[in-house]
């Protein structure tokens, strides 16, 4: 059974098909999942993710069931595999926002329903699908190729974008602080994919080098949820990595800025630049709804073929 845990498990054709279907559903809503049920499991708080999934299944004709950590026996020691067997047998889809990616893997092994990664410490694939739809809408993908820079932390967003760019054949540059590293295993996977797709991928510690000649600039919060006690240290380590007017001037003239939100002005992005690109950033957030719709339909179709 097909799950959506990481973009590593999806081909170029499948990823682009998801984005194209999302674009179609945005223009012409359809109730394609009448009476289907989505279980939403959250170990971490969420605004945009919960709204996107709950609205997506509802507008497609189904219903959502919200489950926080306090609602589950997992918090009392029940094995993940037992919870997966129960929930996976009762619903049509399971969406999970978890602290550890291993929880997703374990749940997917035992679930009879497809499992969707709505964020783990390693990957955030639904966000990248939303980003890709936004890039398509702003005409920043020429002949199937986008020129993208990621500036910031070597986190789940960076990992997911690295994988997507490698599979899709993009020109993709990463700039992270010197004492930060990309997972060697994820980097190796991306390099192998780049050989197949023709992607041009680079890694540096200089944001200006990464931004040169790019049409899309992506950044993310420096202090992720659960890292609040590391805020002071991380702000020092990321000094010089803010996306401001000077940084954007190095990118191509009409480059767009993407941010998965929440954004902290004065840290990863300046107030002026954020507001200048607010239209695209908030449309990026809205686009999560449509890519989730496309993803749910895809997984339902895959399950129907089994």
UniProtKB/Swiss-Prot annotation:
Function: Reversibly catalyzes the transfer of the carbamoyl group from carbamoyl phosphate (CP) to the N(epsilon) atom of ornithine (ORN) to produce L-citrulline.
Binding site for carbamoyl phosphate: 46-49, 73, 97, 124-127, 260-261, 288
A GO cellular component annotation in the UniProt record: cytoplasm
Pathway field: Amino-acid biosynthesis; L-arginine biosynthesis; L-arginine from L-ornithine and carbamoyl phosphate: step 1/3
Origin: domain of life: Bacteria
Stored Gene3D superfamilies: Aspartate/ornithine carbamoyltransferase (3.40.50.1370)
Protein name listed in UniProt: Ornithine carbamoyltransferase
A single GO BP: L-arginine biosynthetic process
Entry-linked InterPro entries: Asp/Orn_carbamoyltranf_P-bd, Asp/Orn_carbamoylTrfase, Asp/Orn_carbamoylTrfase_sf, Asp_carbamoyltransf_Asp/Orn-bd, Orn/put_carbamltrans, OTCase_ArgI
Binding, L-ornithine: 156, 220, 224-225
Cysteine pairs bridged by disulfides in the record: none
Name of the gene encoding the protein in the UniProt record: argF
Keywords recorded for this protein, A-Z: Amino-acid biosynthesis, Arginine biosynthesis, Cytoplasm, Transferase
Localization (cell): Cytoplasm
Family that this chain belongs to: Belongs to the aspartate/ornithine carbamoyltransferase superfamily. OTCase family.
Record flagged with keyword Transmembrane: no
PROSITE patterns to which the protein is assigned, alphabetical: CARBAMOYLTRANSFERASE (PS00097)
Molecular function GO labels: amino acid binding; ornithine carbamoyltransferase activity
